[in-house]
């Protein structure tokens, strides 16, 4: 740890790379909203802001029961201030992500030291899946910040204000993802108290029961909304049946139902899913993370007294999500602040010249080179005739080489070099993705392109859509987007011509049913969330593209 405090230049390097980490995340603000989930959530919040109805959630022009309300409230509030646009959608999520970074720093500083806090913040800012989630915005940035804030106040704040602030953050987190997230927090604190012989004292502390009671009180807005939209109206058709309870779904079906695969939304679980997912999701720090967790497991088996809250929360999340039958890579984002702190604390204990630091320095150098080479490879695949991305990559790579080979002249020690060079390589990759890569591929989000055409040429005219739907069309269109079925559309077309956005297959079906169809325009389409190497190659891309059509439909 002395390596980080002894250099007078360390703080300057830290500030520069922390600013770079923030910047590359902010660069995602100018990108379009990704389909399907991001654009779906943006559209739900759009309807909330436009209608002034902050109680009911709707998608596809029908009642929607899946995620809780908190992210939609924050997004709708942002729309009310900044207008309905992609930046306004992403801004509140970025605020909560930044809050997660702030609490990562504060938590590490309180539990360990200032150098550990600085390294933890750099790891947090440059962890791959956090950067991806700030571009493909869903609920995770909100949850990450709220989760870290709740744990900080319950672990470190003194007095009753810590209990109620932590309860407020935890309640907001529950109203973002569900009651299930309370389990790893409780498990983490129980482990800490048990190992340190404080279990009886903690369980008889009225503050903890006060905090849990306040958490239950603070989630009442969510329960009231669910009751008003669903429990009060058992006649509503949800998940193909009536009598669906929103409150039951919130407490059981959306959480334990997914875990046990008994709810309306099902998946296929793999107990090793997150073991290999973290290898790429926590890049470029994943190897160091696994090493730090192995060290914590050894200490756990020895029952060493000390700080165990973060380890307990992290391991319980890992085990719970691994046992679940419904799994997605971004589920682990919520413990990335704690992963960052554990990794930083373990890393700062390595000493200059010892074999493990030498080995991990070589590992991180290899990972950094792979990241830089990956950027150049993407440029060669996609931009071989455009040299602006290459100039950016060469300049950043030159800086990385200079830092690695001339570190002593910059007052940078071995551990500092490992941390700074890894962070710089990660920032290079993320800058390339947000400046060049995402804007290029998002041109093939056909719904957004169709909405742009409609806003310019047929402004204010409602457009119908039949499956497959486009959530980006719904969000970016200034006019209403009406979801319907083919039979209903033909009935409407008998009265007046209608605008329709749809696929080639649906267009052919309409023609087979003797409808009069005029093609107004067509738009190249590719599901951006399911990238394949062939799509990235310009000469192979046409064979991967589908097309969506703007049609005027009349009944003959």
Protein language model annotation of sequence segments:
Residues 44, 157, 181-304, 309-346, ...:
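Transmembrane-lumen/periplasm boundary regions of multi-pass, lipid-linked membrane glycan transferases
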Residues 120-121, 156-171, 312-314:
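Short hydrophobic alpha-helices at membrane interfaces in multi-pass membrane enzymes
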Residues 109-111, 150-163, 173, 347-350:
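Membrane-interface transmembrane helices that cradle and orient dolichyl/undecaprenyl
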Residues 129-142:
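Short acidic/glycine- and proline-prone juxtamembrane loop motifs at membrane-interface regions
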């Amino acid at each position: 740890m002395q390596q980080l405090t002894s250099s007078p230049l360390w703080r300057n390097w830290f500030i520069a790379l922390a600013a770079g980490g923030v910047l590359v995340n902010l660069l995602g603000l100018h990108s379009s909203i990704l389909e399907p989930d991001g654009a779906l959530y943006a559209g739900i919040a759009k309807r909330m802001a436009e209608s002034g109805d902050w109680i009911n959630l709707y998608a596809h022009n029908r009642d929607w029961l899946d995620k809780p309300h908190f992210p939609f409230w924050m997004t709708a509030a942002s729309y009310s201030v900044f207008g309905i646009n992609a930046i306004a959608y992403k801004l509140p999520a970025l605020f909560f992500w930044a809050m997660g970074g702030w609490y990562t720093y504060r938590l590490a500083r309180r539990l360990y030291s200032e150098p550990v806090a600085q390294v933890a913040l750099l790891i947090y800012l440059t962890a791959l899946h956090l950067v991806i989630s700030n571009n493909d915005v869903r609920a995770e940035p909100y949850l990450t910040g709220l989760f870290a804030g709740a744990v900080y106040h319950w672990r470190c704040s003194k007095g009753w204000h810590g209990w109620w602030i932590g309860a407020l953050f935890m309640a907001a987190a529950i109203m973002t993802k569900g009651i299930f997230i309370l389990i790893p927090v409780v498990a983490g604190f129980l482990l800490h108290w048990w190992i340190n012989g404080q279990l009886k004292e903690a369980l008889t502390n009225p503050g903890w029961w006060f905090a849990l009671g306040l958490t239950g009180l603070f989630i009442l807005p969510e329960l009231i909304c669910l009751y008003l939209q669903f429990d009060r109206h058992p006649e509503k058709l949800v998940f193909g049946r009536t009598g669906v309870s929103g409150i039951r779904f919130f407490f059981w079906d959306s959480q334990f139902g997914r875990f046990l695969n008994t709810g309306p939304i099902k998946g296929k679980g793999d107990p090793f899913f997150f073991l290999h997912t973290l290898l790429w999701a926590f890049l470029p720090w994943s190897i160091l993370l696994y090493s730090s967790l192995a060290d914590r497991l050894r200490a756990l088996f020895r029952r060493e007294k000390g700080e165990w809250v973060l380890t307990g929360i992290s391991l319980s999340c890992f085990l719970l999500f691994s046992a679940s039958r419904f799994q997605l890579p971004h589920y682990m984002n919520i413990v990335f602040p704690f992963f960052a702190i554990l990794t930083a604390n373990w890393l700062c204990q390595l000493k200059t010249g010892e074999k493990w630091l030498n080995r991990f320095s070589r590992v991180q150098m290899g990972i950094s080179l792979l990241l830089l080479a990956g950027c150049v490879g993407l440029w060669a695949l996609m931009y071989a005739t455009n040299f602006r991305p290459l100039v950016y990559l060469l300049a950043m790579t030159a800086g990385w080489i200079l830092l690695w080979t001339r570190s002593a002249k910059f007052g940078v020690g071995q551990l500092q070099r490992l941390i700074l060079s890894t962070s710089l390589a990660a920032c290079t990759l993320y800058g390339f993705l947000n400046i060049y890569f995402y804007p290029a591929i998002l041109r093939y989000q056909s719904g957004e392109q169709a909405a742009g055409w409609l806003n310019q040429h047929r402004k204010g005219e409602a457009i119908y859509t039949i499956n497959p739907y486009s959530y980006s069309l719904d969000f970016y269109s200034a006019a209403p987007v009406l979801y319907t079925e083919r039979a209903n559309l033909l009935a409407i077309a008998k009265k007046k011509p209608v605008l329709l956005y749809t696929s080639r297959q649906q267009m052919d079906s309409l023609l087979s049913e003797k409808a009069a169809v005029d093609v107004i325009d067509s738009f190249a389409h590719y599901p951006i969330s399911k990238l394949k190497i062939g799509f990235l190659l310009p000469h192979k891309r046409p064979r991967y593209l589908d097309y969506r059509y703007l049609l005027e439909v009349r009944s003959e």
